[in-house]
Amino acid sequence: MRVKKLFPLISGLALAACAAGPDYRAPAPAALAVPAAWSDGSAAPEADAALAEWWRVYNDPVLDGLVARAVESNLDIAQAVSRLRQARESLRQSQADFLPSVSASGSGGRNFREGAADNSSYSLGADASWEIDLFGGTRRAVEASRADLAAAGYSLANVRAAIIAETVSNYVTARLAQERLRIARDTLKTVEDNYDIARWRVQAGLVSSLDAEQARAQLAQNRASIPSIEQSLAGALNRIAVLTGDAPGAATRALETAAPIPAAPDAITAGIPADTLRQRPDVRQAERVLAAATARIGVAESALYPSLRISGNVGTSALSLGSLGDVITGGLFASIGQLIFDGGATASRVRAQKAAAEGAFASYKASVLGALEDVENALVALRAARERQVQFTEAYDAANTSAILARSQYQAGLTDFRTLLSAEQSLLSARQGLADADADEVFAAAQLYSALGGGWQTMNPIDGWQPE
């Protein structure tokens, strides 16, 4: 009867329960200063499939293989997966607070006393305790943990996208270094020929030794440029090895065979800013961090309100194992607690959590503005790289023609070596500039795809979390 009398009280309190703290609502775009369109007016959305696996637009099987290895074996991604699993376990721990805790115990013993018969005693018992979530503190804790899990998932997605972008960037750096090596070695052969011609003309008495010395200086300068390019190539290959989870060396040996710089797609559409923000994992992570901080205000506030705990126990004891259960005893208890005074510590924790939520909102808005900045910068970089390509293509054509004419005229004795040297330097500068512009276009395209939030949408579910 006593047990039955407790249920109406518990039910009434449960029905009257409410969740402490504010309900979370995602900030409106207007509060985040999100524009309706990009400054260049582009608005057509990029296809989801192209954005999710954007590196495939370069049509480079070697690059595709490197990205696959990085996604599979990169250690930064592995660390992010571990953090996601920790967040999943934290959520499970929070959810467990909804349920009672039950423990059991048992004992047995035998007493010996001289001159008296031995006797034994045995007991079994169980204790249960349940704190009813009257004011939603546990609900808010679960809400916060669920948001933390989503934030950890989007953090993983952000790491994945960043590793893919870095792999592509280092691959292009390696191919650019190989192209610059090819240019340097081609130029070196030409300079060696010029040196031979200059020496012959000096020996023939046609010119002074100044031509030979100028040619020798040009030859040494071109030879000196090669080691720094080789260093750049080695650095890019070593970084690719680490990104793919390997030690530098054999892992990237196949990349030592030169290949052209991959070509960027003709057109990349940016969509509208609001769509980009939904695609950016770092922005979505920041939004979930804000949701978790808001929920924790309720966790802190719930400590200001009364708490209700139900506890009980049941047990049996006997002098023999066979008699256990013959007599069962137990009890059921309810207790209500209310904080009276703690020097303002609990109220201070509420204020601190509100401040944390304000900081999380500022961080979220900063992520939004940073994402918008990334896209705008990438659009400008891509446009500038393509303009440089056009100009360097024209410069290369003109410099190549000029160098051919200068070389033939010098061989015929119609011009001096300084004119030839100037023409050769202009050709080298134009070739290097065109190679840099080609690579810059690919860098800018990769920067734009990354800024638009590409590279994570096809992730497989991990430990119960999957992108929404």
Each predicted region: which residue ranges?
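Amphipathic alpha-helical coiled-coil segments
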Residues: I77-A80, A87, S145, A152, ...
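Small/polar-residue-enriched beta-strand and adjacent coil segments characteristic
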Residues: A20, E53, N59-V62, L66-R69, ...
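Terminal intrinsically disordered/low-complexity segments used for targeting and assembly
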Residues: R2-E72, R146, E230-R278, R284, ...
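Periplasmic alpha-helical coiled-coil/stalk elements that build and connect Gram-negative outer-membrane
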Residues: T138, Y154-I272, A381, A385, ...
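Regular, well-ordered alpha-helical segments
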Residues: E89, A96, Y154, A161, ...
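Hydrophobic, well-ordered secondary-structure elements that form the walls
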Residues: I310, I336, Q353, A357-A360, ...
